[in-house]
Amino acid sequence: MSPLTLSAPPKVNLFLHITGQRDDGYHNLQTLFQLLDGGDQLTFNTTNNAELSLWPQIEGVAEQDNLIIRAARALQQQTGCTQGCSIELHKRLPMGAGLGGGSSNAATTLLALNNLWDCNLSIAELAKLGACLGADVPVFIEGRSAFAEGIGDQLTPIDIAESWYLVITPPCKVST
């Protein structure tokens, strides 16, 4: 099968209201996720064995901790798929910038491999699987801007008038 290349879009929170702290360490919130154009680019080459690889490695992130590999493994485990994949990442989004790069990469991986491996999970099933990887993953699975509550996993799709955004990322990282 020929390689599949997809963009993993970034997002911005047009507003963010923290409404409480949960016992599991997450915060309850209300936010408006706006998906943007651009983002990281991922190329998927399927293999006939169950091995997963990611190139290039991201400095400071062990491969087994990378959300791309974790998403692929989660899909294998959920579906019993015995195929594998070699994944190339062209990183365009800065890490720790609050743009959802890791979550978007995980969602893009789930969507791509669900298709390439013929897993046939629904969008709702992929969103549920993605929520186990990160609170922002479901909005990227849904693929459209949304009002979010809970930990960001209770989504109401919304149409937002097209706007232009200038995103400036300072030379520091924020753990989100």
What are these regions (language model features)?
Residues 15, 45, 55, 86-90, ...:
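Solvent-exposed beta-strand sheet faces enriched in polar/charged residues
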Residues 77-88, 112-133:
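Phosphate-handling active-site elements
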Residues 2-82:
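N-terminal beta-alpha supersecondary unit
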Residues 97-125, 139:
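DPxDG-like acidic metal-binding loop motif
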Residues 72-73, 110, 131, 139:
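Residues within alpha-helical segments
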Residues 54, 58-65, 96-103, 116:
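Short gly/ser-rich anion-binding loops that grip negatively charged ligand groups
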